Amino acid sequence: MNADVVIVGAGPAGIFTALEMLRRGSKKKIVMVEKGRALEKRSCPKAKTGVCMNCKPVCHITTGFSGAGAFSDGKLSLACEVGGDLPTLIGERLAQETIDYADKIYLEFGADEHIEGIGNEEKVRRIRARAIKAGLKLVDCPIRHMGTEKAHDVYLGIEHYLMDHGVEMYFDTECRDLIMEGDVCRGVYLTDGKKDFEIRAKHTVVATGRRGADWLEKICSEHGVEHQPSTVDIGVRVEVRNEIMEEINDVLYESKLIGYPKPCLLYTSDAADEL
């Protein structure tokens, strides 16, 4: 099969790649390949059993059209200070403009217009000042909270829109490798579990997301493609009495406090080993 563009992965990155091409009037033949299922065919047995069944070959919560987004609580963080290295890569101004642009697309497909965490500027200012005195930086981020059911409906609408506008989708289909001719990618080798086949394309977009990170790292290493993994935030959950956080929670829907420890000296038993 031949195509103008083949997109590997139908998570948010792959979805918005196809969506943006259509919005710009592209007439190119676009093919999306996803190892999970179409959204309306995704279901998790844990909803009935209460126990994770470790579904094979894929988890239907994290793979399939829209990735984990369709079964999340549908929170869209609308400030560039939250969520990744995009401001560092393209600058804060462009990052924020891009977030605002993507947010408008979600609204077009039915996302709730209400935004949490805005207003109360004076109360936020006072909380920020108190945080600074405590050696903390307050990050207050507006949140568009779609909710699980609305997130599912929004992504289902996007899926149908792409199909109605000619995007071909191959579900339950895994990318095995890239078709490389010299230093040029000419498409992808695929398998649907029953047969192997290939799609040759003028442009190949690999958008496998966090779930496909190990596979992408392997492919890049095999083909000599320079790459750098992004960071993964690991933290702990600390629960405190409501009275402690009540003021912040009443003013801010969702906030982050970044701590900056004071400089300190660490001594060992030997003064010469001062650090």
Give the location of each predicted region.
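Short beta-strand "acidic-cap" motif of Rossmann-like dinucleotide-binding folds
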Residues: 29-34
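A conserved short coil-to-beta-strand element within the FAD-binding core of flavoproteins
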Residues: 171-184
